[in-house]
Amino acid sequence: MREVISINVGQAGCQIGNACWELYSLEHGIKEDGHLEDGLSKPKGGEEGFSTFFHETGYGKFVPRAIYVDLEPNVIDEVRTGRFKELFHPEQLINGKEDAANNYARGHYTVGREIVDEVEERIRKMADQCDGLQGFLFTHSLGGGTGSGLGSLLLENLSYEYGKKSKLEFAVYPAPQLSTSVVEPYNTVLTTHTTLEHADCTFMVDNEAIYDICKRNLGISRPSFSNLNGLIAQVISSVTASLRFDGSLNVDLNEFQTNLVPYPRIHFPLVSYAPILSKKRATHESNSVSEITNACFEPGNQMVKCDPTKGKYMANCLLYRGDVVTRDVQRAVEQVKNKKTVQMVDWCPTGFKIGICYEPPSVIPSSELANVDRAVCMLSNTTAIADAWKRIDQKFDLMYAKRAFVHWYVGEGMEEGEFTEAREDLAALERDYIEVGADSYAEEF
């Protein structure tokens, strides 16, 4: 067995977690109360597959290997009373009494510290139920207080306690349209600095990019958080499908790092997904393998706003789902390689890693997304993602030059030096990306 424990931290993390588990349950044929759908003798995905994410109790019920943590009760109370209340064990849902007030320092140093022991104890219990735990999957936002502060504290502690286990993150990057607080740049820079050495691979999801996709591809004039989370869940499901169903690539978490991370700090792959279609448009589109493969290289299908044509690719994984044959994939990849827009770094072979999972993508009934026969999720490590760091660093600098809002952080026991230290670390990260994108032969002169 190769189990994965999902840890959802903060409001964004928990709400994305809800969307994911609703989709996972549907994909594996598990009902809202944790029992199998009628007519199934065991969950879809084969014994090895579903048990990475679900634990079977003695009563034939399937329980997600997941923990929800938030510093205030509202979001987790919604899980306790919502449609999936019987799916989760009450011990999996942990909340505090007062929130982090969008303050990294409250989540990391004061309020978060009070709850962290309880969370780790629950994680320990869950790890004991596993035969061969392979690692952790985090979902949290970088801009909120709990997601950034408590999220990074947990990652730090887990890396000491479970050093060899993989730690993958799905991190929500703040966006101007959906900004919930003015201090998001501070929280993002501080949490990235703290987690940089502890996370093995971080898939960033930029709210602005998702917002635009919902408007453009799905025709939603004013996308809500539940629309955004539904789309994010679809992407996370595609990334994890190879862990949950029989597939040939990325069958365990370590493989993500091996295939995508050339240097420990350069661990922020860009995620693209296609096709993203509304139910109205789906009947008019063919979605051949080459069409969806090409779509992954278009900025409109990326989960982070950046321009890959200005960057260079270091590694590429294409994860297909559904009705796909290898010959079509090879032909599609050849077409892509012949395009002048796709530039690889010169020190890395132009290899594309291909994974095919024959289980077609599912869509929850209330979703705006159309049901399709095949889909592809591309994970690419590209130097273009440094744009995202540049954007947030500039916003950080504007505020920090005036020391705006800093007293709220210092008041929670944080030292001001941590701001400059974190900012310097991110400046170094930007430089790292410039260096890996430089041609290797240029250094000889």
Curated annotation (Swiss-Prot):
Localization terms from the record: Cytoplasm, Cytoskeleton
Cofactor dependence: Mg(2+)
Keywords per UniProt: Cytoplasm, Cytoskeleton, GTP-binding, Hydrolase, Magnesium, Metal-binding, Microtubule, Nucleotide-binding
Catalysis performed (reactions): GTP + H2O = GDP + phosphate + H(+)
Residues the record marks as active site: E255
BP GO terms, sorted: homologous chromosome segregation; microtubule cytoskeleton organization; mitotic cell cycle; mitotic sister chromatid segregation; nuclear division; nuclear migration along microtubule; nuclear migration by microtubule mediated pushing forces
One GO term describing the cellular component: microtubule
Main localization, broad class: cytoplasm
Binding-site positions, Mg(2+): E72
Enzymatic class: hydrolase
SMART domains: Tubulin (SM00864), Tubulin_C (SM00865)
UniProt entry tagged with the keyword Ribonucleoprotein: no
Membrane-spanning segments: none
An annotated Gene Ontology molecular function: structural constituent of cytoskeleton
InterPro entries: Alpha_tubulin, Tub_FtsZ_C, Tubulin, Tubulin/FtsZ-like_C, Tubulin/FtsZ_2-layer-sand-dom, Tubulin/FtsZ_GTPase_sf, Tubulin_C, Tubulin_CS
CDD domains associated with the record: alpha_tubulin
EC numbers, comma separated: 3.6.5.-
Annotated residues for binding of GTP: Q11, E72, S141, G145, T146, T180, N207, N229
Function: Tubulin is the major constituent of microtubules, a cylinder consisting of laterally associated linear protofilaments composed of alpha- and beta-tubulin heterodimers. Microtubules grow by the addition of GTP-tubulin dimers to the microtubule end, where a stabilizing cap forms. Below the cap, tubulin dimers are in GDP-bound state, owing to GTPase activity of alpha-tubulin.
Stated family: Belongs to the tubulin family.
Note: Present with 12300 molecules/cell in log phase SD medium.
Oligomer and partners: Dimer of alpha and beta chains. A typical microtubule is a hollow water-filled tube with an outer diameter of 25 nm and an inner diameter of 15 nM. Alpha-beta heterodimers associate head-to-tail to form protofilaments running lengthwise along the microtubule wall with the beta-tubulin subunit facing the microtubule plus end conferring a structural polarity. Microtubules usually have 13 protofilaments but different protofilament numbers can be found in some organisms and specialized cells. Interacts with NUM1.
Protein's name in the database: Tubulin alpha-3 chain
Encoding gene per record: TUB3
